[in-house]
Amino acid sequence: VLQRWATKELTNLLDHKLPPNIHLQYQGLDLSLFSGSLKLQNVALEIHNKDTASVSTKLNLDQLDLKGLSYWQILINKNIKLGTIKLISPKVIYQPSLKAASKDSVAGSKSEKKFPAKLNSISLDHLVISDGQFTMMKKTGDSIGLSLSNLNITLDDIKSNKEIIQNKIPLKYANGTMSAENFYADISPLLDVRIGSLNLKNKTLDLKEVALKTKYSKEELSKVITSQRAYLDLKIPELSIKDFDYGFHGERFFTTITEISVNNADLLVYRDRRPPDDMRYKPLYGTLLQHLPIDLTIAKTNVVNSKIAIELLMAKASES
């Protein structure tokens, strides 16, 4: 009887009592009070922007498994304690909002974050995401800004409470691993980055088949630019980032790296000298590094067995 009542109440909650900007569909729900487990199958979730009603996030999920919910911790200690959450084959599409943040919302982001009033803490032994896909669209919504596939993530000993949630990173975890393939990022109107595979484990990030390349061919670039711009084609078969760490010093984000190793890099720089120079002020790289919006520390960089080629297309004497 209790099992049927709990299943009915949970179904009613998911079907009718979620916030109006959250739309959830699923085909199968399996709840076990005895083992503290929940399984949802063929999940489709949409989160809409409250101000525009447009869809900001879509999630399709083959299966969600939750195991090891401790009722004793909830009832006696007011803690939510979970064993394992597994997300199987999640596919996420995120659409950033075109609307700029208002002054009120920016100011509100610095206000105290609210933890569930009747709870002391939330903890999770293991979070497992397997065979995921993530796509972030550009703000205009007409093209992809970032994407990756075969995403696998594990996090252990995750926790949050009234104090931790006030931090810039509102949770803590002990160990984590991450791997993915087919990474793509549109980083500027002329450049994109592609990475064949990436793997993060024990604070070491290994990248394979890294490519930074101009979106146009040499000939096409010459047709679209109005002043001189370099054509870039950088290939790095293997790149390793060791002792990678990150966090916040107060309000400022930091990243520290003990060593970056680059093997067999091949860089081609091509410049068509026929268009006019861009005479606008352009700060040197040293100045740009001094004014980064984050604190970046790289102790050592190794570049091995690599080459750089520079090609110039000069204007003919009759054209000058």
What are these regions (language model features)?
Residues V1-P19, G141:
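N-terminal type II signal-anchor transmembrane helix
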Residues T140-G141, M314-A315:
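A short secondary-structure junction signal
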